[in-house]
């Protein structure tokens, strides 16, 4: 159970490449305290909701305030459950699958000239990019706005799950893929 309300066993991950990298195992406490940081690719052992909470703590206002980010996420999940009548964890998984870019650009040097080259994105980076863009979109939408961060996070997750281009995460993904397509 997540937040003692939502069933984690009912969640399905549709993207076969991301199954290994999205951890939805039940956790009593979404605070590992960096337990997996010393392991290679240890972040795949962390619950995806805790990773979202950690991404919310990136901006200046929320830096280091894990309990505040925890409450924001919990209240956003309540709003998602009320509006969609579905498991909010499933909505988050759908949002991550939709918001993760499939290809991006890297720079190669050929004889002193930097040339952009399109490359595939690893599944773990897709999850990281999706979570980062969802959290960034929510904090940007709530900055100097009457809407609270809770409502902005819920709206961002639901819009990304619908693959709505008004979502910051989806628009960022499309921008990255468009640039990569031009660099083929």
Curated annotation (Swiss-Prot):
InterPro entries: Ribosomal_uS7 (IPR000235), Ribosomal_uS7_arc (IPR026018), Ribosomal_uS7_dom (IPR023798), Ribosomal_uS7_dom_sf (IPR036823), Ribosomal_uS7_euk/arc (IPR005716). One of its GO terms (biological process) is translation. One of its GO terms (molecular function) is structural constituent of ribosome. CDD domains: uS7_Eukaryote. Pfam families: Ribosomal_S7. The keyword Ribonucleoprotein applies. Disulfide bonds: none annotated. Keywords: Ribonucleoprotein, Ribosomal protein, RNA-binding, rRNA-binding. GO terms for cellular component: small ribosomal subunit. NCBIfam families: PRK04027.1, uS7_euk_arch. PANTHER family: RIBOSOMAL PROTEIN S7. Belongs to the universal ribosomal protein uS7 family. One of the primary rRNA binding proteins, it binds directly to 16S rRNA where it nucleates assembly of the head domain of the 30S subunit. Is located at the subunit interface close to the decoding center. Part of the 30S ribosomal subunit. This is Small ribosomal subunit protein uS7. It comes from Thermoplasma acidophilum (strain ATCC 25905 / DSM 1728 / JCM 9062 / NBRC 15155 / AMRC-C165).
